[in-house]
């Protein structure tokens, strides 16, 4: 074989071992001893990981590239002088997309993808705005961005109706057209509180999704019993439509409320167990995002049930939240401090669980084939300046190398392509 690359002295958490990794023709040819790697290749470039962490890249399972950097461009963040107000932010979002040209949207998305790749992110699911006024303008801009960065990054595009799929027939037409243009999934948002018709909204999600044979990823922000009822009904519709394993509920704040109620002796039954039963039966996946995850989100219980959970950055310096540096370790650090008061997620097992959300959990949620460091898988590799996932999070470790399909695309936190 003609050799491409050897990564020597790579620590793989999945094996808890330091190995050499041989890469040829964009795929992993050998993992193991120096002799095995040398035998697989002939005259490769060598990278010495020095015993540090190597993994197959972060997965940003929930992000909005479409409004990325909308808070940037001035000395201090724009749209950031008042406390958070959802209604005001929705109005600003509408105004932003109506007034921003497609070229700017594409350029901002590409800039954020390049920033993400430099931080070791190689995969994402991007929720992308549609409504009855802008139609598919934003979708088309993000699809163009996807094409521009395709050599660096894999991204799924979700057609996301911020004001609901029932906000007029034009929205449903925009959703259908978006899927025909190349969007990968249908999005949705709180069926009860946004469009005031829970059942009809969910039915419409599945009607449009099944027409185009695409998966669903819906924002479910509603808390309390309304939120858990929404999740249960989504799960029931998934089973009814044969969509087991094809639906994601993003945010799902109500699960944290259900966990609190389940610990209250005044509450009858087991509210958390009931909704988790429904999600498990329908194989509904979940995403959570560090800017908004409520304390008490029961990600440990989700893991015990085998429910797939990914993590997303959600915002990237945008008009909703000015945070977001496209750096998943930043999100994991925040989560390690806020998820519970006992600092469970600051322990070594807790940090390992958070790391899994950023990597294999997200890969499972997105259905990424060949994700991992095994012979025959695509040579997507990230080398971090940390000896373990735990120290990568706690120390906010630098990214030393990012390798995409066997090609080095970033070194020392900067793109080289």
Model-derived regions: residue spans:
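His/Asp/Glu-enriched, well-ordered alpha-helical/loop segment
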Residues: 215, 236-247, 299-384
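C-terminal cap of metal-dependent C-N hydrolases
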Residues: 364, 375-417
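N-terminal metal-binding scaffold of metallo-dependent hydrolase/deaminase domains
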Residues: 1-41, 389
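Alpha-helical scaffold segments that flank or form the walls of functional sites
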Residues: 72-127, 133-148, 174-180
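Metal-coordinating catalytic core of metallo-dependent amide/deamination hydrolases
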Residues: 98-99, 128-260
């Amino acid at each position: 074989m003609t050799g491409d690359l050897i990564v020597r002295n790579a620590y793989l958490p999945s094996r808890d071992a330091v190995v050499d990794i041989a890469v040829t023709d964009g795929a992993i040819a050998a993992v193991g001893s120096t002799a095995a790697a040398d035998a697989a290749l002939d005259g490769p470039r060598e990278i010495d990981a020095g015993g540090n962490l190597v993994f197959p890249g972060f997965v940003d399972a929930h992000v909005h590239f479409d409004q990325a950097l909308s808070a940037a461009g001035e000395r201090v963040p724009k749209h950031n002088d008042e406390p958070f107000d959802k209604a005001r932010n929705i109005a600003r979002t509408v105004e932003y997309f109506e007034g921003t040209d497609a070229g700017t949207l594409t350029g901002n998305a590409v800039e954020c993808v390049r920033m993400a790749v430099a931080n070791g992110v190689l995969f994402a699911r991007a929720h992308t705005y549609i409504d009855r006024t802008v139609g598919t303008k934003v979708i088309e801009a993000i699809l163009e961005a996807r094409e521009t960065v395709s050599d660096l990054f894999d991204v799924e595009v979700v057609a996301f109706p911020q004001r609901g799929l029932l906000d007029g027939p034009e929205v449903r037409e925009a959703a259908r057209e978006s899927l025909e243009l190349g969007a990968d999934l249908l999005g949705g948002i709180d069926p009860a509180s946004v469009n005031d018709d829970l059942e009809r909204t969910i039915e419409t999600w599945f009607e449009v999704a099944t027409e185009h044979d695409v998966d669903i990823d819906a924002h479910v922000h509603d808390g309390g019993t309304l939120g858990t009822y929404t999740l249960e009904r989504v799960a029931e519709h998934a089973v009814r439509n044969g969509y087991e394993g094809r639906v994601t509920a993003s945010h799902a704040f109500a699960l944290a409320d259900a966990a609190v109620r389940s610990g209250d002796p005044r509450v009858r039954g087991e509210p958390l167990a009931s909704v988790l039963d429904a999600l498990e039966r329908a194989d509904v996946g979940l995403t959570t995002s560090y800017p908004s995850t409520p304390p008490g989100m029961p990600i440990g219980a989700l893991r015990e049930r085998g429910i797939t959970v990914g993590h997303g950055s959600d915002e990237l310096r945008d008009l909703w939240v000015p945070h977001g540096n496209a750096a998943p370790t930043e999100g994991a650090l925040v989560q390690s401090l806020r998820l519970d008061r006992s600092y469970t997620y600051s322990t070594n097992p807790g940090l390992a669980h958070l790391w899994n959300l950023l990597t294999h959990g997200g890969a499972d949620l997105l259905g990424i084939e060949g994700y991992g460091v095994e012979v025959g898988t695509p040579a997507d590799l990230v080398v971090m300046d940390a000896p373990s996932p735990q120290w990568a999070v706690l120390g906010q470790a630098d990214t030393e190398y990012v390798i995409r399909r066997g090609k080095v695309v970033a070194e020392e936190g900067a793109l080289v392509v």
